């Protein structure tokens, strides 16, 4: 069997990126089939409509391309391995990233295993904007060619073995090119907007959705000087650096500068705010990260110079990383950084190569 006749199962989401990925792989001579994953049991009509519409779009694309579409239900795995952890993090006052967890537990674990074992796949493929490069017998994860759409931040937990079994066709293209291909092919997904909701749960009203699973506890909003200036509806609805949705204006004595969340006192259920997006209380000189995943799976010891992102779409921050023990590192930024948020991920890069990352355990505040 030639390399190009190998079987690839494409994770079809009903979006434009996975649609074009399937076509690109066909052009490269692979034997292509699609798989639609259902990872959330509908609990309302709106969600049912979204999932049903996505499945219909995925089916329409597969019909157009002449490929088979399989479906699988990973709702139990999603609930146990993604959603419960997501809720636990929010309950603890942290801000998790469900997309990273979802890629780790569902797309590149449950899907990868199902495709290989049940469907006889040689590879899986997704519509992620990342690239892979094989160097010295190990697969590396590279940023997507379209720097505006690069999704390597969300895939840092993957091992070189998982990357070796995965193909990322649109990672070599820019988004407008992908849409143009879909339009030229007459695919129903060509003009479909990118999804921005929680991984697999969709674009629902987040506050209302979270409130179904975690009872909100209203509490005080106080300034860094200790003045009470309002009430929050639940700490879980707020994250460091947040400006919108606080329901407070400028103070009489102060400026009209907007208020930002600078800290959360989880024990006392207090939200702490300050004025100005570069208030010293919002700045960090570094962070401690844990639950580390290095793509090459080699243990990290000593120190290294690299760049880091503490949130998606952030400009790379030059930093020095130092191993504290097997599963914790200290990261010191070259310049202070705003809104470093516990629960989010710190992801490290050496140029185009994504080295891996970890969960931000604590930030190292700017000494005041």
From Swiss-Prot:
The keyword Oxidoreductase does not apply. Disulfide bonds join 102-199. Keywords: ATP-binding, Cytoplasm, Disulfide bond, Nucleotide-binding, RNA-binding, Transferase, tRNA processing, tRNA-binding. Residues 149-151, 311-312 are annotated as: Interaction with tRNA. It holds the Pfam family tRNA_Me_trans_C. The record marks 128, 344 as: Interaction with tRNA. The active site is at 102 (nucleophile), 199 (cysteine persulfide intermediate). GO terms for cellular component: cytoplasm. Its EC number is 2.8.1.13. GO terms for molecular function: ATP binding; tRNA binding; tRNA-uridine 2-sulfurtransferase activity. It catalyses: S-sulfanyl-L-cysteinyl-[protein] + uridine(34) in tRNA + AH2 + ATP = 2-thiouridine(34) in tRNA + L-cysteinyl-[protein] + A + AMP + diphosphate + H(+). The keyword Disulfide bond applies. CDD domains: MnmA_TRMU-like. ATP binds at residues 11-18, 37, 127. Interacts with TusE. Catalyzes the 2-thiolation of uridine at the wobble position (U34) of tRNA(Lys), tRNA(Glu) and tRNA(Gln), leading to the formation of s(2)U34, the first step of tRNA-mnm(5)s(2)U34 synthesis. Sulfur is provided by IscS, via a sulfur-relay system. Binds ATP and its substrate tRNAs. Belongs to the MnmA/TRMU family. This is tRNA-specific 2-thiouridylase MnmA. The lineage of its organism: Bacteria, Pseudomonadati, Pseudomonadota, Gammaproteobacteria, Enterobacterales.
């Amino acid at each position: 069997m030639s390399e190009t006749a190998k079987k690839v199962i494409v994770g079809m989401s009903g979006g434009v990126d996975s649609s074009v990925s399937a076509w690109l792989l066909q052009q490269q001579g692979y034997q292509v089939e699609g798989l639609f994953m259902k990872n959330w049991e509908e609990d309302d009509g709106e969600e049912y409509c979204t999932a049903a519409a996505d499945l219909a779009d995925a089916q329409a694309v597969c019909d157009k391309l002449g490929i088979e579409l399989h479906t699988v239900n990973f709702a139990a795995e999603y609930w146990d391995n993604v959603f419960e952890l997501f809720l636990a993090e929010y309950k603890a006052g942290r801000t998790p990233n469900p997309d990273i967890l979802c890629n780790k537990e569902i797309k590149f674990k449950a899907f990868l295993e199902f495709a290989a074992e049940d469907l006889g796949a040689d590879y899986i493929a997704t519509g992620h904007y990342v690239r892979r490069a094989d160097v010295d017998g190990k697969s590396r994860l590279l940023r997507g060619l379209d720097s505006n759409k690069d999704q390597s931040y969300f895939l840092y937990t993957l091992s070189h073995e998982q990357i070796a079994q995965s193909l990322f066709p649109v990672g070599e293209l820019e988004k407008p090119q992908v849409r143009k291909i879909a339009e030229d092919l007459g695919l129903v997904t060509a003009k479909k907007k990118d999804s921005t909701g929680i991984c697999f749960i969709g674009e629902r009203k987040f506050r209302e959705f979270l409130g179904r699973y975690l009872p909100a506890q209203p509490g005080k909003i106080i300034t860094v000087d200790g003045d009470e200036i309002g009430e929050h509806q639940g700490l879980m609805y707020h994250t460091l650096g947040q400006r919108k949705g606080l329901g407070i204006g400028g103070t009489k004595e102060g400026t009209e500068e907007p208020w930002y969340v600078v800290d959360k006192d989880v024990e006392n259920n207090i939200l702490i705010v300050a004025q100005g997006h570069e208030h010293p209380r919002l700045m960090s000189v570094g962070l401690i990260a844990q639950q580390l995943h290095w793509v090459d799976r080699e243990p990290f010891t000593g120190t290294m110079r690299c760049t880091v992102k503490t949130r998606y779409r952030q400009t790379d921050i030059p930093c020095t990383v130092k191993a504290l023990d097997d599963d914790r590192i200290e990261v010191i930024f070259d310049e202070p950084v705003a809104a470093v948020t516990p629960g989010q991920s710190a992801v490290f890069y050496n140029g185009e190569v994504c080295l891996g990352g970890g969960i931000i355990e604590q930030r190292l505040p700017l000494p005041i």
